[in-house]
């Protein structure tokens, strides 16, 4: 092998995500989130201690739960309209609208420009879990 091939192989080893490591990361994330919510087979998110979470944590937890529910095929889409988020959390839509825009500015939540639905940025999943599980 020449130097270029060795360099390419080294870069590949550093950047190529191994399924086992990704799965292990997701297992650790699931362990942390299991103290906050559970997911019914219908895809509904059931909070363990709803009153201990602020609105940002509730929205992030709900959207993260929907991410996993969609990943496992329990629901068709992880994306939610703000009215559906407000209904699921029993909070005023206007209150949550301001908060979700703030989460978007932090890069934790994205909004689909075609239909206005919100979803978590899965590349920030570790940051999102840290935000959800931080002590108030």
Regions found by a protein language model. Name each.
Residues 89-105:
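Short amphipathic alpha-helical interaction segments
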Residues 77-87:
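A short alpha-helical element within helix-turn-helix/winged-helix DNA-binding domains
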Residues 104-114:
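A short, conserved structural fragment
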Residues 52-56:
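Short helix-coil-helix linker/hinge
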Residues 125-136:
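Short, amphipathic alpha-helical interaction segments positioned at domain boundaries
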Residues 58-78:
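Short helix->loop/beta-hairpin flanking segments within DNA-binding domains
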Residues 1-51:
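Long, low-complexity, charged/polar intrinsically disordered regions in eukaryotic proteins
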Residues 79, 115-121:
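Minor-groove-contacting beta-hairpin "wing" of winged helix-turn-helix DNA-binding domains
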């Amino acid at each position: 092998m020449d130097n270029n091939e060795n360099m390419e192989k080294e870069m590949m080893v550093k950047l190529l995500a191994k399924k086992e490591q990704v799965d292990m990361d997701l297992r650790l994330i699931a362990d942390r989130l299991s103290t906050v919510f559970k997911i019914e087979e219908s895809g509904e998110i059931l909070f363990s201690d709803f009153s201990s979470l602020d609105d940002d944590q509730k929205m992030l937890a709900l959207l993260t739960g929907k991410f996993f529910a969609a990943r496992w095929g329990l629901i068709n889409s992880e994306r939610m309209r703000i009215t559906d988020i407000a209904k699921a959390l029993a909070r005023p839509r206007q209150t949550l609208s301001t908060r979700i825009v703030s989460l978007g500015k932090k890069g934790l939540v994205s909004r689909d420009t075609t239909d206005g639905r919100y979803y978590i940025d899965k590349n920030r999943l570790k940051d999102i879990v840290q935000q959800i599980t931080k002590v108030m």
